[in-house]
């Protein structure tokens, strides 16, 4: 992992396939006059960030030894210490820019989606499942869109008319009640709508058809995934990623890219407009359903999101508070996407240990448990990673030490399991 204070912007215009996902190949101009932080001047967000030499960074960011296995960290690339060892304070302007595209043709997916078929699950069932996993079982239309894009790859490439079907089901008042709320208390004119399932205990009987259940049984993620979804144990995807990137460029939706976005934010890296080198298309198969459940309030994207420090609470959470800005190398980006289940296991372990920043594990832990050589490489590993696979085989490393054991099912879910059996 390298320390990097430069901002490079990649207008995506070419894509190639590799392995289980499609890396986004970019061409860019090194003479670009666009500057990320200058672009955020309209938000007026300034923060005093102490920066210091971090020769002891790997030790200070390690998780407590009782939480994760004791494994030696590899050497991290960093800037050489300067002559002045005293921490200096500089004012740095940071913020988040929404990816607003004038046309979807600006960024095109590389996937050959001719073999993708719409999941035979009704829109009313999709809306009900999204609502079931929302805090207080209340959800906005945008929350339903994000939930669908997050979990079913077909909709990332489909014509967006499906969103009209979602809105129609929510507003039909046959199965959902409507509430209004003010996302900004200071602005009385702006109001949003929440939708609530009528008779939430009757979702199975009223809203899920036999065809829906047949699809659940055949899904590659297994019946347990939908069992958790029925029980509300999946949760909603984190909203800020979808309001900035996922809804605007749907084929970049999904748990893998969402995790990358928040981990970068935790490292002090704000992803710039169309800076797509960090993201991948995961269209060959559905995600592995290893993501932990996040619980956060709905955040409506306004200028106050990046201008209020409280709304950027993940910023720098993966580093010491007096951090330098770290970045992923291209090789580490590949590893992050390939080993996403290991990353989610680290999050879950941090959560079990009651660590405050469990959503964004420390840089040291990501390097050790996600980029480390103790995790197995999947089939069709790109050439750039074959050296890691070879070393792992020579060392006799086969199993992921963070792989979760299957646990006994919650008795409260037995009825759901029986319904899905």
Swiss-Prot record:
Compartment annotation: Nucleus
A molecular function GO annotation: RNA polymerase II transcription regulatory region sequence-specific DNA binding
GO terms of biological process kind: anatomical structure morphogenesis; cell differentiation; regulation of transcription by RNA polymerase II
Residues of the DNA-binding region: 118-218
Consequences of knocking out this gene: RNAi-mediated knockdown causes significant reduction in the expression of 21U-RNAs, upon simultaneous knockdown of fkh-4 and fkh-5.
Keyword terms: DNA-binding, Nucleus, Transcription
Highest taxon, organism lineage: Eukaryota
Keyword Chloroplast included in the entry's annotation: no
One annotated Gene Ontology cellular component of this protein: nucleus
PROSITE patterns recorded: FORK_HEAD_2, FORK_HEAD_3
Function: Transcription factor. Binds to DNA sequence motif 5'-CTGTTTCA-3'. Regulates expression of a class of small RNAs, known as 21U-RNAs, perhaps acting redundantly with fkh-4 and fkh-5.
Name of the protein: Forkhead box protein fkh-3
Gene, per the UniProt record: fkh-3
